[in-house]
Amino acid sequence: MVAPISYLTLYNAHNGDSVKIPKPIRFHSLNGLKSFIHESFTDYIISDIENIFLLTSFGMKVKFNIINELNDIYVFDKRLFSGARDETIINAYVNQNEGGYKEMIKPTPSSLVKLEKTNIKQMTSSLKVNDGWSKALFQDCLGVVGQMKAYVKQINTIFKCLNIIFQFGSNFINGIEKSFNNYLNYIKLLNLKTLHRSWNGYYNNLRKFPSFQLKNGTGNIKISDHLNTSELEKSSSFVSKTLPLVINKFNEMSASINSVNDDKVNVDKLIESLRNESIENFKDYDTGSEDIIKDVSRLSQLISHDIDKLSTNVSISLDWVYRIHKDEISPKIFDKATGLYKILQNLYLFKNKIVDESLSIFGKIANLQMRMVNIKNDLRILTNADDNNDIANENEISIHVINNIKSAEDYLSLTIDLPLLFGFMLIEKRRQFEWHEFYSKGIVNNVSEQLSVIIDHEKIFRKLWLKKFGNFLSILNSKDENDALRTVLPSIDVTLVNGNAESNSTFGIINNIQVERDDISTYINALEEYSNAGTTSSPSSKKFSELMKKNFQDLIKCTNNMKRVTKMVSSLSSFTSPVANEIKNNDKLLANSKDENNDKQAEGGGHMSELGEVDYDINLVKGLKIRIRKLENLLHQQQYKDLSNWPVTRSNGANATSTSETDGKFSLILDSNQKTSTSSNSKIDPTNLLQRRQTLPLKLGHEKPTTSQQSNHLDVSTTIDKHLDNIRLKKENNELTNENLKLSNTNRTNEKLIEALNKQISNLKTVNDDQNKHHEEKLRKRDAENQQTITRLETELQAFKPQNNKEVVDLKDKLSLRDAEILDLRKDITRLHDVNEGFTEEVTKLNEKIATLQSDINDVNAMKKDLLSNMASKETDTINHRISLEEEIKKLHSKIEELTEDYENLMDLTQSKHNNLDIMVNYLNNMIIHLLSSIKCLVEQQFETFIEFCFILESMGLLLIKEHNNNKNLDEYKITRVKGLKSKRNDKIVPTSANGNVLDETPIVSTMGNMPTSKVVDDINKIIGWVDDIQSFKNISTKSSEDGDEKSCSANTAGSVSSSVIDDLPEEITNLSVEETNKFNRQSLELVKLFRDIFKSSNGSISKFEDFINTIRFKENICINQNQDDSGVSNKFFLGAITKRFKDVEGFAKKLTKENKSKAHELSQLIGKLNCKISMNSFEMDDLVLFLPTRIDRAEEIDENFQPWAAFNIGAPHYFLRVQKNEGNKTGITHSIKDKEWMVGRVTYIEEHTVTDANFNDKDANPFHLSTGVVWYVVDAKEEIF
């Protein structure tokens, strides 16, 4: 399986933006990563990579060697930590990723207004426009939710960055505070234990310490005399004067640190308050926004569903649907969209708020760090020694003053500790003396002797071997004299350097005194008496005697260890002596006979202890004769050395002369002839004593050695060889000593374990024997008592048997009980025997364990030998490898120098080429800038021409639209007729086709008052968005280029290009500085990028420029309505649409004229019919109404002169005919209807009245006695006669 790709995420701490970089990181250094952040991530807002500050998620600085192990890196701008508020920088960061917030339009209310029921067509059109409005608003809501999520993510990132920078500052502060606290605790401890006030009492007690005399001393010693009273007073005065100053200084620094911590807590509270505010305001934004989206979607679908029902179901009331959409659904959609937009607005404002607050947080953190830096500098002055000022002013607190206080306190503390210190000096001086004595006289001398004896043993063995097999070897080596075997071994000389013990130790007041162990014991007793007498007031002084005793025991242990080392060194030669084999054989015999008799002494050279351990002391006595002979030989050799002044010291490879030959004595191994010749030669020439003896090889080969061969065997070692050999030998000796110490410790541990086990075994045996003896003694006593009791009872039985048989029976019972007790005792004895056997088995197991430990010791010794041999070989390999590496380094250095020279020459050759290419590139840059500016002017002019065409079309009621062609399955541009476009161009309208179908349900809303209504203008405006890139590029050009752009643009407008600016460009470019050249190099990259974006096609799609040209020509993807009259004009997109519009208007005008005539005739006929029909409800002017006489139900009195007439109606009561005077007027039909049963009249006037509590009883205001609140009408009518 392919491993998933991991990313490194960069977060901008000032706007919450982020970017991901795949791992592993392809940058070669941290500056490379910073350059990427400067160019791509921050868009050059940060201005310089030195202003970039990177932190990890743990508040630590980023290290490039671990960058691939990180997942998150947080980017900070150092300029925002200065404390000065730079609004331009923070605004640039905010505007970098604000998204589409400023482009989002605030939700607008529905365009539905109150319409009359009869206006069906307008209601239908308004409902369709409202459907498009709801869908558009739903899409806007989705965009708002997406932007809300982006803002929430950015806010969370900013909060995390605030926590990280706070953690970074806290770590910095805590580190300095921790260092300060260490010194503060030291000063506090110094102040707590100061003696500048109480030293007098301790000094007086010290003066009471008794004087004493050493065995080798010259007089009595009184330790209080070693302290100077004036010096004590001076130290006390100095401490009392300077210590308060030091304490005050540290208290001031502690107060500053506490103030910093308080400010740090305030910063933390500020961050926490911002976080709590965000939680309080936006904790439910997820669920709230989702609910709003669901509600808006549901309501929008409900609007679309109602409109679909209107087109399919005629029974649904249009007026009801219109009223529901206008009064209920549309306001809900608008309210929810407005609420969602308000949440987005609050998020945007809160993000800007925390960005603004972060500036103060950054400034406070930087201020805290600067204050801690000042504290750190003050602490450094107080704690670091100044080599240039050895004498510091007492009033100025420094490290010198603190050290002087410590020295003064140490001197004052001697008033308490001097008895203990003096005792330690006595013990240490004695320990060093004993160690030096054992080392110089015991170890060094014995090592020299033992090593020489070991060499002699090897010589003897080689000579014996040559005696047995040399005859055969001489036959094989007869032709090659150089291969003759010789009995030659290296010599050794161990000397003690710097061996004066008195000159190597300094003890001040007891330098010239020889200390004995009895002196130490006497001093300890005096110290105990001094402590027990109660003269001291210090609690710690009562423990002085215990400490002295413990130190004295350590001295004894150290001396005993040196004794053991000396004993071990003295036994080295016993392992290689001729009797060593006998010792080993005896060891085996003793080990085999150990089980038979552990107390017998083994026969042979050694003794075996109870644990089978060989005692080599007796064997060493047997080897003393050999060592004495060796010493005699060395003495004889030294005498000849003094006579001839010939060097005696040998190197490892030097050939030493056999000691058995130098003194003239005969060897027991060699022949008599050889001995005689050797003795005679040594008497003739003393220097021949130092030559290698080759008598045996000469005899075997029957040849005489030449003079050159003899000279080769001389010792030609130099002082340098001796020094190197001594160094190597010392190193090996140290290693062997360390290894020997380890093995000794292991052996000592095993011996202690064996001793403990032996003690345990002996204790168990003793306990077991004691128990056996005790039980046997107890058993004997019990048997004797029983026997006496039986005899006594038998006697009594015989005496009392005739008298009392009952007592006899009782006595028998008691006897049986005693027998049972005896049996129990015997069982206890048997059990103890079993326990004893168990202890015996345990002892056997312990013996086996001891044998195992002994074998482990042997294995460790063998391992030590292997390690020594491996170390020697590894050292040789290391030296050879180092020499080869040094040769390779020299070769590489020479190659580097050659490559450096070649590289410098190559750089000189290519520098001139680069300069010429830079000039040409800069010239081409300016040419491209002028061309791009000209293209920009042409595109803008073409776009303005297109806008003019759109205005012409809209002035004629035509609209350029883009709709989807289902047959061709592509979007086509089409010019269509839109009703009401001329009068309501800035209102929301619906484009329709010729057959009345809606072409685009999205409401057409003009965002600018001087722009056409067509949405195609916005599409083309988006297509030419790349023109703004040219404008932004021109802003970063040089002054000459910008002037040239303006001239070029104006010239292109006139149809020509300015050549004066272009001709001047090369001369200006050649005079550019390095900074300007770098600027043009960046411009070159930006121009290439801009050219690719505008003119290069990618992924099979056309370029942006070709897209604009193809679109603005309107030659492709267009729908043209063919005109039969003029095919040449109708093939043109805009001209054909305009011509068709004029012809449609003419045809439509003719059609309307004809229809108006027919409609006028039909209208006159309908009016005539309508005037002859009686109305029954909703009475209006000119309606024909039937009036009938009626009566008043609640009238108390009937007025015969007043007859009310009511209009015949359905659902419209209280319409009464005016038949009497009203405000001085009298109707014309008062007398004509007096005797009629009905009357038909045409309404001329209708007057409305309302019955209230005030006019209820008024006959004029309520002539018909109607109830309160009833609305009634008075109708003036003209009688119609048929």
Curated annotation (Swiss-Prot):
- Highest rank taxon of the organism: Eukaryota
A cellular component term from Gene Ontology for this protein is: vacuolar membrane
Q: Does the keyword Membrane apply?
A: yes
- Enumerate composition-biased segments (Basic and acidic residues): 593-602
- How does the protein's chain sit in the membrane according to the entry? Peripheral membrane protein
InterPro entries in the record: ATG11, Atg11_C, ATG17-like_dom
Under Pfam families, the record lists: ATG11 (PF10377), ATG17_like (PF04108)
* Principal subcellular localization: membrane
Q: Which GO terms describe its molecular function?
A: molecular adaptor activity; protein kinase binding
Q: What are its GO biological-process terms?
A: autophagosome assembly; autophagy of mitochondrion; piecemeal microautophagy of the nucleus; protein transport; reticulophagy; ribophagy
What keywords would UniProt list here? Answer: Autophagy, Coiled coil, Membrane, Protein transport, Transport, Vacuole
Q: What does this protein do?
A: Involved in cytoplasm to vacuole transport (Cvt), pexophagy, mitophagy and nucleophagy. Recruits mitochondria for their selective degradation via autophagy (mitophagy) during starvation. Works as scaffold proteins that recruit ATG proteins to the pre-autophagosome (PAS), the site of vesicle/autophagosome formation. Required for the Cvt vesicles completion.
For this chain, the family text in UniProt reads: Belongs to the ATG11 family.
Q: How does it assemble?
A: Homodimer.
The name this protein goes by in its record: Autophagy-related protein 11
What lineage is on file? Answer: Eukaryota, Fungi, Dikarya, Ascomycota, Saccharomycotina
